[in-house]
Amino acid sequence: MKLKNFLTSLFLVFFTFSVNAEELNIKNQNTEFNVYTGMFDFSDDGKKSTLLGFQHQNENLNKDTFLGNLSPITGALITADAAGYLYTGVQAQYKLGALNITPSFTPGLYFEGDGKDLGHLIEFKSELQFSLDLSNTSELGFSYNHISNASLGDKNPGANSYTVSYTHLTLPTKRIV
């Protein structure tokens, strides 16, 4: 039942974003898609599980600030134990030649499934990713993240995860409206 609720929520979020994207009708849109896999809660032998995730970033919404170049991100992950995390937040990107350092912070909704009980529906993911440019439109990366409810619940065990990711940037295309 929890997996059904998670998948329904995931569908509604992506449907909402796709409708809004069509309404915006941005002609020169750079979009970044990130697919990743790894180990959820690798530091807990009893509850570690493989994970698969997807993340989206609209490059047109980047903003230069005193913290660097910030942009909004939205994504979801699911574990082999049918736990899921649906999130949206912000990331910064720092380029050092072909090396990219990308910290991010994303509040989200965690669905336990048959996975680890993190103590609350609302969880916060802090992540640090290192990636290398493969070309001007793709990257290969490694990241570490921690998901925690910041003591919103009665318990707050947290989960430490690592992932390997592939990122692809779509370049602007001329749209026929």
PLM regions with names:
Residues 40-50, 76-87, 114-121, 151-159:
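Solvent-exposed loop/turn segments connecting transmembrane beta-strands
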Residues 32-41, 67-79, 102-109, 143-148:
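Transmembrane beta-strand segments that form the barrel wall of outer-membrane beta-barrel proteins
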Residues 50-54, 70, 84-90, 124-128, ...:
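Hydrophobic, lipid-facing positions within transmembrane beta-strands of outer-membrane proteins
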